[in-house]
């Protein structure tokens, strides 16, 4: 099943590259953020997969408008596997 997600991720990233090569030059620089929204989307999909990556990209596109100040907005880091002590909400010592 993981193979299907990789294929979908590659397809989405390929579509974003076509957008950057063909459509984006016609529109000119419009993104208020660094990295650009298309670069953000490619990184998010590559890092988190097509579902969560697309969700992060959609949220980013929702913030990319004239009333938002923009600025540096990197893709969040991928979660690491939690250590036993970091996932525990108890207050006592850990064995």
Curated annotation (Swiss-Prot):
Keyword field contains Membrane: yes
Classify the protein's membrane topology as the record does: Peripheral membrane protein
The entry's localization annotation reads:
Cell inner membrane
Low complexity bias: where? 83-95
Q: GO CC terms on record?
A: plasma membrane
Q: Which family does it belong to?
A: Belongs to the UPF0161 family.
Name listed for the protein in its UniProt record: Putative membrane protein insertion efficiency factor
